[in-house]
């Protein structure tokens, strides 16, 4: 169970998330050994409050349509504030428009802006099969460390099929609608290395 806990990022990223909500997630992470994924504005507080917890935050969240310079600056700042890993949202507008090099460069500049591992959120529920492959290939070429299935804000969540597809390119963080031990197990069996879930504590309690 301890090994499973270290592969779960207990997540709190809702639009009304308070510092108190983040502290509650961190308390659970401390107790269970889970990682935590918190909003950018709480990174500094979280790093000070729970220095032993592996801390992830998000960049360009939730739509990925910030300018590349803004994303890169955000990544640099959040790493300096204490984030151990960064989940950056890909710009799907560029992908959908067929501007593959611009899509890749947007991600590559974020990766280059920090020494922290960068996971690229491809928002798989919004993509067709060709777009999933292109997004995964281009993120790989941008030197991403992981692919992440979704932000959790789009309709549809993580699927076994998407994890299987994406894991042929890079390690995968499955996220979006995972709230049970059965779902988590299915994602791990499909090849996910990590899971992001707002119900991390409930998953471990089953």
Task: Write out the residue ranges for each language-model feature.
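Short, well-ordered coil/turn segments that N-cap beta-strands
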Residues: 32-34, 51-53, 82-84, 114-118, ...
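Glycine-rich phosphate-binding active-site loops on the catalytic face of alpha/beta enzymes
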Residues: 61, 80-94, 141-159, 174-206
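Conserved N-terminal beta1-alpha1 strand-loop-helix module at the mouth
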Residues: 1-81, 134, 138
